[in-house]
Amino acid sequence: MENIPMTVFGAKVLEAELLKLKNVSRPRIIENIVTARAHGDLKENAEYHAAKEEQGFIEGRIKEVESKLSRMQVIDVTKLNQDGRCVFGTTITLMNIEDDSETTYKIVGEDEADIILGKISCHSPIASALMGNEEGDEVTVKAPKGDIVYEVLSVEYI
């Protein structure tokens, strides 16, 4: 199994999710199952079957999160050699050469990616094109609608 790169923030979010699943969701669903069982015949007890189905989802998610946590490689960008290069965890401001529009992205792990928040996966075409480049470099991103050329305006280790 391969390691899963993750920022410090991403690791904390995943750890918090696991705690909530184990300490809130799991006990709640067990209580729901006990309550539904008390209603009698389990064959036609929709409440019971729904609770058991939810229990399956919760237990599956717990296993998935535990697996990710066991394989995660936490990368603290503030402790990296800050040589100005685009690497995992850096926040990069780009200017589209064609229309002079600016965009800022943070390169994060797969599970943390959220384009609306400006967080892109380290495996995305944009991140792949940016890796290793530095302020002032022009980078060509192969996008579905065609090549897009950006200038790297800044690289921050925050």
Curated annotation (Swiss-Prot):
One of its GO terms (biological process) is regulation of DNA-templated transcription elongation. It holds the Pfam family GreA_GreB_N. Keywords: DNA-binding, Transcription, Transcription regulation. NCBIfam families: greA, PRK00226.1-2, PRK00226.1-4, PRK00226.1-5. Necessary for efficient RNA polymerase transcription elongation past template-encoded arresting sites. The arresting sites in DNA have the property of trapping a certain fraction of elongating RNA polymerases that pass through, resulting in locked ternary complexes. Cleavage of the nascent transcript by cleavage factors such as GreA or GreB allows the resumption of elongation from the new 3'terminus. GreA releases sequences of 2 to 3 nucleotides. The keyword Transcription applies. SUPFAM superfamilies: FKBP-like, GreA transcript cleavage protein, N-terminal domain. GO terms for molecular function: DNA binding; RNA polymerase binding. This is Transcription elongation factor GreA. The keyword DNA-binding applies. Belongs to the GreA/GreB family. It comes from the Bacteria.
